[in-house]
């Protein structure tokens, strides 16, 4: 056991991705008036909570991770850390993260983090991931919480912008996850995990990817229509979203489903990164009504 194991078991890549979305929500709510001490506390607090969830996930999935090519070398599978130590480590990370969010941000931000944590560890990892094709849908709520945490840490209110962020990032999670399930089809089949491509076929997953990307594109527009983000954000969101939709539609003609799915997955990362950046730099004063720009 080494320091490397303590880092690897937290899934640093997932933490980094969540930091980007936390920052997007935080700066969206800040509207140019940034409290950097608060920002640092929110980023660290959320990262600790996410890390805790990932460690718990590693503990829960240790019996199926050895069946999958991409997870067979994880710390718990290789015996790099005992279950007792991993559970204690996960608990410590969680307590530290929730405490930091509660004390340095506000109870609402901590509550949002708790909801995401419970959904990911309890409903998704412990239950639905192995039992239902709808596990991805439920799990998407946890993946959508980081930008909401960032936003609520500043605004201390769960308003239309927070709802929009929750919907946007939940919708984004679906095609992102389905794409992974397609190019990792053999892994999920071997572990008997009922993700959509395995349970209902790749064609069904392709249809859902197109529908969810379309819904995501429509949802991204709401930040501008609600008066929370500017036209620069709208232009980037529309361009990225429509190209992602075009790419998703191309799945119907794809000769190599795995190659196509990897492209959809890769562009999903670019899309959510671009939107997080744009909502950070092109925020507007919040509107009281939905159709600010439609008057």
Curated annotation (Swiss-Prot):
Pfam families: UbiA. GO terms for molecular function: protoheme IX farnesyltransferase activity. Pathway: Porphyrin-containing compound metabolism; heme O biosynthesis; heme O from protoheme: step 1/1. Keywords: Cell inner membrane, Cell membrane, Heme biosynthesis, Membrane, Transferase, Transmembrane, Transmembrane helix. GO terms for biological process: heme O biosynthetic process. Its EC number is 2.5.1.141. GO terms for cellular component: plasma membrane. Its main location: membrane. It is found in: Cell inner membrane. The keyword Ubl conjugation does not apply. InterPro entries: Protohaem_IX_farnesylTrfase, UbiA_prenyltransferase, UbiA_prenylTrfase_CS, UbiA_sf. The chain crosses the membrane at residues 9-29, 36-56, 83-103, 108-128, 135-155, 163-183, 209-229, 230-250, 264-284. It catalyses: heme b + (2E,6E)-farnesyl diphosphate + H2O = Fe(II)-heme o + diphosphate. Belongs to the UbiA prenyltransferase family. Protoheme IX farnesyltransferase subfamily. Converts heme B (protoheme IX) to heme O by substitution of the vinyl group on carbon 2 of heme B porphyrin ring with a hydroxyethyl farnesyl side group. Carbon 2 of the heme B porphyrin ring is defined according to the Fischer nomenclature. This is Protoheme IX farnesyltransferase 2. It comes from Pseudomonas entomophila (strain L48). The gene is cyoE2.
């Amino acid at each position: 056991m080494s320091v490397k194991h303590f880092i690897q078991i937290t899934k640093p890549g997932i933490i980094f991705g969540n930091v980007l979305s936390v920052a997007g929500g935080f700066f969206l709510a800040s509207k140019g008036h940034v409290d950097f001490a608060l920002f640092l506390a929110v980023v660290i607090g959320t990262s600790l909570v996410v890390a805790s969830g990932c460690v718990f996930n590693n503990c829960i999935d240790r019996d199926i991770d050895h069946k999958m090519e991409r997870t067979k070398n994880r710390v718990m599978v290789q015996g790099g850390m005992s279950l007792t130590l991993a559970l204690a480590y996960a608990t410590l990370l969680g307590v530290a993260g929730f405490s930091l969010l509660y004390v340095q941000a506000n109870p609402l931000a901590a509550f949002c983090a708790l909801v995401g944590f419970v959904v990911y560890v309890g409903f998704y990892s412990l239950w639905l991931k192995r039992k239902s094709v709808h596990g991805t849908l439920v799990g998407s709520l946890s993946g959508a919480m980081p930008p909401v945490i960032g936003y609520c840490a500043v605004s201390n209110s769960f308003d239309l912008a927070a709802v929009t962020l929750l919907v946007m990032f939940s919708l984004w999670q679906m095609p992102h996850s389905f794409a992974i399930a397609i190019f990792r089809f053999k892994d999920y089949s071997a572990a008997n995990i009922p993700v959509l491509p395995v349970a209902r076929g790749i064609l069904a997953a392709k249809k859902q990817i197109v529908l969810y990307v379309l819904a995501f594109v429509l949802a991204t527009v709401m930040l501008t229509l609600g008066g929370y983000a500017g036209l620069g954000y709208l232009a980037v969101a529309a361009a990225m979203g429509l190209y992602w939709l075009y790419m998703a539609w191309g799945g119907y003609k794809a000769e190599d489903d795995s190659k196509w799915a990897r492209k959809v997955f890769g562009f999903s990362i670019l899309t959510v990164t671009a939107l997080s950046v744009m909502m950070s730099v092109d925020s507007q004063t919040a509107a009281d009504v939905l159709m600010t720009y439609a008057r």
